[in-house]
C-alpha cells in the first residue's frame, strides 16, 4: 500500500482510529468481518510490516504511536539491509505521538559498496522502518520521499506465518529472526 509516497509493506489498508491516527491492517477490512474478534484484533498487529521509502530530501519524519495504555513497541531503521547508525537504529514507540527522524546515511558510497560486495538483498538507498509487533498506529509521514522501485527489493518474497515466534512478533530481536533475514 502506498501512503504519502512511502510503501506500507505487508499492510493492505489503513483505517481511522478513534485517537486521530490510523490503524494499519494486514488484510482488508472486508476480510476482517468474517474473522473471530481475536483474529480481527490481530489484523492490526504490525509484526512483519515495514515503512519503506527513498529519501529525496535531507530527512523524513515519521509520527507513530501505540494505542493509549499499551506497552511500548520498537522500530528498527535500516538502509537497505544494513542497520542505520547506533543513534537511530532502534526507536521506541510509546502510547503518545512518537517521532522517528531519518536522515541520509553518512557515507552512501560505503553502504553501496558493502551491499554490492556482500550481495545483500536490498538496495542501500532504500530506507526501511521495520515494525516489530503490536498495533503500531500511523499518525503522519513528512518529508520529500518516494516509494521503492521494483529493483530495490528482492525479487523473491518470503511469507512466514504461524506462531508468534514463527513470524517474529515475540522474538527479542525481531529484525534478526529467520523471516526477516
Question: PLM features: what roles do these ranges have?
Answer:
Residues 1-157:
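N-terminal secretory targeting modules
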Residues 178-181:
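Short helix-loop-beta junction
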Residues 156-176:
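Catalytic nucleophile-elbow at a beta strand-turn-alpha helix junction centered on a G-D-S/GDSL motif
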Amino acid at each position: 500500500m502506498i501512503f504519502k509516497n512511502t510503501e506500507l509493506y505487508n499492510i493492505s489498508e489503513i483505517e481511522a482510529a478513534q485517537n486521530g491516527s490510523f490503524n494499519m491492517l494486514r488484510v482488508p477490512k472486508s476480510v476482517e468481518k468474517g474473522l473471530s474478534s481475536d483474529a480481527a484484533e490481530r489484523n492490526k498487529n504490525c509484526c512483519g510490516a515495514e515503512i519503506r521509502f527513498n529519501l529525496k530530501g535531507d530527512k523524513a519524519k515519521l509520527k507513530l504511536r501505540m494505542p493509549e495504555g499499551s506497552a511500548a513497541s520498537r522500530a528498527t531503521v535500516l538502509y537497505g539491509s544494513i542497520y542505520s547508525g547506533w543513534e537511530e537504529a532502534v526507536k521506541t514507540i510509546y502510547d503518545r505521538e512518537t517521532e522517528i527522524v531519518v536522515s541520509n546515511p553518512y557515507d552512501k558510497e560505503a553502504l553501496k559498496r558493502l551491499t554490492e560486495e556482500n550481495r545483500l538483498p536490498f538496495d542501500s538507498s532504500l530506507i526501511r522502518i521495520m515494525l516489530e509487533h503490536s498495533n503500531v498506529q500511523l499518525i503522519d509521514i513528512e518529508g520529500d520521499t518516494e516509494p521503492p522501485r521494483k529493483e530495490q527489493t528482492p525479487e523473491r518474497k518470503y511469507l512466514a506465518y504461524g506462531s508468534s515466534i514463527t513470524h517474529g512478533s515475540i522474538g527479542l530481536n525481531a529484525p534478526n529472526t529467520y523471516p526477516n533475514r
